[in-house]
Amino acid sequence: MASSSDHTAKIIDGKAIAHTIRSEIAEEVRGLSEKHGKVPGLAVVIVGSRKDSQTYVNTKRKACAEVGIKSFDVGLPEEVSEADLISKVHELNSNPDVHGILVQLPLPKHINEEHILGAISIDKDVDGFHPLNIGKLAMKGREPLFLPCTPKGCLELLARSGVKIKGQRAVVVGRSNIVGLPVSLLLLKADATVTTVHSHTKDPEAIIREADIVIAACGQAHMIKGNWIKPGAAVIDVGTNAVSDPSKKSGYRLVGDVDFAEASKVAGFITPVPGGVGPMTVAMLLRNTVDGAKRVFGE
């Protein structure tokens, strides 16, 4: 029998899986265009000129072009008033060519994010953050119109890798509104037994060691060590943390919340960082946009 030292986890290649999904979506968009003479449309609203936000928006624009989704880019100055931003959102709500609206977060401090997210029409809320969509996600027997993209991507990675969720013990590390909380609710809906580990949790490693599935979304580089992982567990690492690396041109490299080198010797399945969850988030945004358009087209 192989010793634990030469065990290597199966790498869940998010890039390859996302590529497959994007090909499926492109085919669907072609079909919609032929049948209805229209294509799905995604509006991305960006406020100010944050470099990271612009990078994300460019990635989304390129992804839309690749699958045939029409992009509507709305750039507003940093000093835009909350009222003007809401009125722009309302304008997009009433535009029949727009089937999804995404407001790039974070917003400047003088704007209340909750007010903006609440202003997006629930049937165009492709980010899945509208309070009514999250509320439906939390309730048994209700179906939200859209699921948040990163949590949806995490479950899609598990499903497409053949990882069983039903009846398994899942531990989610982190409880943010963007990932931790909604992914816990999604796992619960999929019949996992779910525990959330957060900053006030006593003895987190003991809890994580019990998990058949670990979703790491705490935003702390290499917080989760290899010996915290149950042998054979599936590990989905949502973290993207910049750590100093003088050997890189940029001076830093991206690492996850899990110590990949250690954990991959113990886990059954693991996602790399980068190239794991990130590409799936964009693929799920495209999927949500197409689903929104299909509802409008009466499909």
From Swiss-Prot:
Alphabetized InterPro entries for the sequence: Aminoacid_DH-like_N_sf (IPR046346), NAD(P)-bd_dom_sf (IPR036291), THF_DH/CycHdrlase (IPR000672), THF_DH/CycHdrlase_cat_dom (IPR020630), THF_DH/CycHdrlase_CS (IPR020867), THF_DH/CycHdrlase_NAD-bd_dom (IPR020631)
Enzyme Commission designation: 1.5.1.5, 3.5.4.9
Name of the encoding gene: FOLD2
SUPFAM superfamilies: Aminoacid dehydrogenase-like, N-terminal domain, NAD(P)-binding Rossmann-fold domains
Name of the protein: Bifunctional protein FolD 2
Catalytic activity: (6R)-5,10-methylene-5,6,7,8-tetrahydrofolate + NADP(+) = (6R)-5,10-methenyltetrahydrofolate + NADPH; (6R)-5,10-methenyltetrahydrofolate + H2O = (6R)-10-formyltetrahydrofolate + H(+)
GO cellular component terms given for this protein: chloroplast; cytoplasm; cytosol
Recorded family membership: Belongs to the tetrahydrofolate dehydrogenase/cyclohydrolase family.
Subunit relationships: Homodimer.
PROSITE patterns reported for this sequence: THF_DHG_CYH_1 (PS00766), THF_DHG_CYH_2 (PS00767)
UniProt pathway: One-carbon metabolism; tetrahydrofolate interconversion
GO molecular-function term, one example from the UniProt record: methenyltetrahydrofolate cyclohydrolase activity
Keywords: Hydrolase, Multifunctional enzyme, NADP, One-carbon metabolism, Oxidoreductase, Photorespiration
Role according to the record: Catalyzes the oxidation of 5,10-methylenetetrahydrofolate to 5,10-methenyltetrahydrofolate and then the hydrolysis of 5,10-methenyltetrahydrofolate to 10-formyltetrahydrofolate.
UniProt xrefs under HAMAP family: THF_DHG_CYH
GO biological process terms on file: photorespiration; tetrahydrofolate interconversion; tetrahydrofolate metabolic process
